């Protein structure tokens, strides 16, 4: 039985990274440092811009986060690819929440637009994922649009985020 709540704590997300939240066959989130969210604040099966599912998650920002120390020295900024990866992570998490089984793999993205950045002075990053389609056949796949906000300001968007679940990812 899938643990299908509307919100999840950091402890829940860490359980997902160990394969304990959605069962042994369900998709896992990555472990820290690559886990790019601290909590999921809302999940619905029929919400979002397209009425086909919605996820909202948050990451608390502190100046001592690992990426600020190396990207870039003297000009610290969160790499945009980490925000993109967070959106893929959330698409896979949603597929597990729906009961999908397999190992999650990012399959692509249509277009990504950056219009801002995450600096060490920021307090919170918010991710919003709007599902366009979920395919639940031999291949389980989610297709969604996503947006990233920092302290309430929209800073980037991605369309056509695609994540698939694979029973055997060795041949992927």
Curated annotation (Swiss-Prot):
<dbReference type="InterPro" id="IPR010083">
    <property type="entry name" value="FabA"/>
</dbReference>
<comment type="similarity">
    <text>Belongs to the thioester dehydratase family. FabA subfamily.</text>
</comment>
<protein>
    <recommendedName>
        <fullName>3-hydroxydecanoyl-[acyl-carrier-protein] dehydratase</fullName>
        <ecNumber>4.2.1.59</ecNumber>
        <ecNumber>5.3.3.14</ecNumber>
    </recommendedName>
</protein>
<dbReference type="GO" id="GO:0019171">
    <property type="term" value="F:(3R)-hydroxyacyl-[acyl-carrier-protein] dehydratase activity"/>
</dbReference>
<keyword id="KW-0413">Isomerase</keyword>
<dbReference type="GO" id="GO:0005737">
    <property type="term" value="C:cytoplasm"/>
</dbReference>
<keyword id="KW-0456">Lyase</keyword>
<comment type="function">
    <text>Necessary for the introduction of cis unsaturation into fatty acids. Catalyzes the dehydration of (3R)-3-hydroxydecanoyl-ACP to E-(2)-decenoyl-ACP and then its isomerization to Z-(3)-decenoyl-ACP. Can catalyze the dehydratase reaction for beta-hydroxyacyl-ACPs with saturated chain lengths up to 16:0, being most active on intermediate chain length.</text>
</comment>
<keyword id="KW-0443">Lipid metabolism</keyword>
<keyword id="KW-0276">Fatty acid metabolism</keyword>
<keyword id="KW-0275">Fatty acid biosynthesis</keyword>
<keyword id="KW-0963">Cytoplasm</keyword>
<dbReference type="InterPro" id="IPR029069">
    <property type="entry name" value="HotDog_dom_sf"/>
</dbReference>
<comment type="subunit">
    <text>Homodimer.</text>
</comment>
<dbReference type="GO" id="GO:0034017">
    <property type="term" value="F:trans-2-decenoyl-acyl-carrier-protein isomerase activity"/>
</dbReference>
<dbReference type="GO" id="GO:0006636">
    <property type="term" value="P:unsaturated fatty acid biosynthetic process"/>
</dbReference>
<dbReference type="Pfam" id="PF07977">
    <property type="entry name" value="FabA"/>
</dbReference>
<comment type="pathway">
    <text>Lipid metabolism; fatty acid biosynthesis.</text>
</comment>
<feature type="active site">
    <location>
        <position position="71"/>
    </location>
</feature>
<keyword id="KW-0444">Lipid biosynthesis</keyword>
<dbReference type="InterPro" id="IPR013114">
    <property type="entry name" value="FabA_FabZ"/>
</dbReference>
């Amino acid at each position: 039985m899938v643990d299908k709540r509307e919100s999840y704590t950091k402890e829940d997300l860490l359980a997902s990274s160990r394969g304990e939240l959605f069962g042994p066959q369900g998709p896992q989130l990555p472990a820290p440092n690559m886990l790019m969210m601290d909590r999921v604040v809302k999940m619905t099966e029929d919400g979002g811009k397209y009425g086909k599912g919605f996820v909202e998650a948050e990451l608390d920002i502190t100046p001592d986060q690992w990426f600020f120390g190396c990207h870039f020295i003297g000009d610290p900024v969160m790499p945009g690819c980490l925000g993109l990866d967070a959106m893929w992570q959330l698409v896979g998490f949603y597929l597990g929440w729906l009961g999908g089984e397999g190992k999650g793999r990012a399959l692509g993205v249509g277009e990504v637009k950056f219009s801002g950045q995450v600096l060490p002075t920021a307090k919170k990053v918010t991710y919003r994922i709007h599902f366009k389609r979920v395919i639940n056949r031999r291949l389980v796949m989610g297709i969604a649009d996503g947006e990233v906000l920092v302290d309430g300001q929209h800073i980037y968007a991605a369309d056509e985020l695609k994540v698939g679940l694979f029973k055997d990812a060795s041949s992927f």
